[in-house]
Structures are given as C-alpha cells and as structure tokens.
Amino acid sequence: MTVLINEVSKYFSKQTGTVQVLENINFQLEKGDFVTVIGPSGCGKSTLLKIVAGLDNDFEGEIIIDGERITKPSKKQGFIFQEHRLFPWLTVEENIAADLSLKDKYVKDKVKEWVEIVRLDGFEKSYPKEISGGMSQRVAIARALLRDPSVLLLDEPFGALDAFTRSHLQEVLLNIWEQKKTTMIFVTHDIDEAIYLSNRIVIMSAKPGKIHKVIENNLPYPRSKTSESFQEIRKKVLQQFEHGGLIQTSI
C-alpha cells in the first residue's frame, strides 16, 4: 500500500460560523495507481490534495504514506500546482535540481535523465522567461519527480494551457507513469482528461465534500477519446453527475 486517506474531515472557520469542507474521506491507493479526482467547484478537491501533500495539517483523520503518518511535506510527496512556480533567476536544469547542487554528479545525472524524459533537451541553460508555459510545466514535473516521491500530487496542472499543449503534456505524463510507475493523484475539472489518464476516477460531491463514487477505468493504453469504450465510461461518469445532483454546479 502506498497511500491511505483515513476518515479525513476538514472545517473552515468564518465570521458566520464553522463550515465543513470535507466529510469522512476514505480512500486507498496502491503503488502505481493513477487516480483522477473530479467534482463540482468547491467540493474540496484541492483542499484534499494539500492535506495529502502535508501542506495543511489542520484536519481530522490521518494520511499514511508507506506506513508513515504525514503531518508535513516530505520527500514522499511531489506536488505540481496549476502555475509552474519556477524560480525566474534559475535555468531549467537549476530549477529541476532546486535546492540540490548540480556539482554533485549523481544530481547532475538525475537532472539530465529528467530533462530527456520530459523532452527538454537543448533548453537546460534557458531561463523560464525564454520558454513556453507548457515547457515550464514540464520543468515543474521533472522537479517534482527528481527525488522519486512515493506519490505525485497534481492540482489541475494543465488547466491554464491551450488544448494542443494540454494534450501534449498528457502524453508526457503518461509516458512518465508508464516508465516509472509513480503513484499519482490528479485533480481536474475535465471529464475527458480524467478518463484519458487514470485507472480510477474519484467523483466528489460538495457541501461538504465527500466521495460520491469511484469508477474503475480498465481501458487499455494508449486510449482514444473517440472510441466507443471511452464514450461508454464518459456516459457513466456523466450519469453520476446527473443522478447524484452534481451537475447543478460547473465541472
């Protein structure tokens, strides 16, 4: 077992009182799982991801990764935000290395490996302002995976990108997953993206956020979004939104 989300609930305090954001979230991921999380805006998807990342420890319940209770960020979790958050004064390879020294041969070799995996060969010495948004997200992916985390957490990482770039980065991410079998939790608003990438789809309901349904996705890779089997799963997901009353809010 890689990740256990056990009885997780979350509350926010406001002037009008206490608001429950998450209610009794229970979920387990095995090593190599690729899970996508979808649901209405405000259902707590990103909040849950931050809790798993150790970025928010004010919650009820527990997060266990590789048998260890998580209370803060560690090398067990890699996190990718919607914005790439690169350091503008560092080059591509320096951003991937982050706080590690490129003078260390092991680090330099690992950076070189990830530059090749995310297809940034020739841009190692470039600065963030000199590369595109899609390339910047590839740098962020490589940086998050450099330390071989137990789980990679992605919070709508392709949401701000154009359709072509998003499609390209989906292929890059799947290639990484197939090579490394890193456990991944990917939050998205895009149903097609959720089906295309993952082997399990977690559908959340809102107010408070809870798991409404988990759909197994056994479509073989590579996948075609126009195939009959893909459309069948899409129909199944949409039915959950309609029958569960989740379609009232934008997804």
Curated annotation (Swiss-Prot):
Q: Does the keyword Cell membrane belong to this entry? A: yes
Q: Which InterPro entries match?
A: AAA+_ATPase, ABC_transporter-like_ATP-bd, ABC_transporter-like_CS, ABC_transporter_ATP-bind, P-loop_NTPase
Task: Establish whether keyword Metal-binding is in the entry.
Answer: no
How is the protein disposed in the membrane? Peripheral membrane protein
Q: Where in the cell is it found?
A: Cell membrane
User: Per its database record, what is this protein's job?
Assistant: Part of the ABC transporter complex SsuABC involved in aliphatic sulfonates import. Responsible for energy coupling to the transport system.
Read off the lineage from the record.
Bacteria, Bacillati, Bacillota, Bacilli, Bacillales
Domain spans labelled ABC transporter: 3-231
Q: Which UniProt keywords apply?
A: ATP-binding, Cell membrane, Membrane, Nucleotide-binding, Translocase, Transport
Taxonomic source organism: Bacillus thuringiensis (strain Al Hakam)
Q: Tell me the protein's name.
A: Aliphatic sulfonates import ATP-binding protein SsuB
Output a single Gene Ontology CC term carried by this record: plasma membrane
Domain of life, per UniProt, equals Bacteria
Query: Which PROSITE patterns does the annotation name?
Result: ABC_TRANSPORTER_1 (PS00211), ABC_TRANSPORTER_2 (PS50893), SSUB (PS51291)
**What GO molecular function annotations does the UniProt record carry, in alphabetical order?**
ATP binding; ATP hydrolysis activity
The record's comment on protein family reads:
Belongs to the ABC transporter superfamily. Aliphatic sulfonates importer (TC 3.A.1.17.2) family.
EC no.? 7.6.2.14
Description of how the protein assembles with itself and partners? The complex is composed of two ATP-binding proteins (SsuB), two transmembrane proteins (SsuC) and a solute-binding protein (SsuA).
| UniProt-annotated binding residues for ATP | G39, P40, S41, G42, C43, G44, K45, S46
Instruction: From the UniProt record, list the reaction(s) this protein catalyses.
Output: ATP + H2O + aliphatic sulfonate-[sulfonate-binding protein]Side 1 = ADP + phosphate + aliphatic sulfonateSide 2 + [sulfonate-binding protein]Side 1
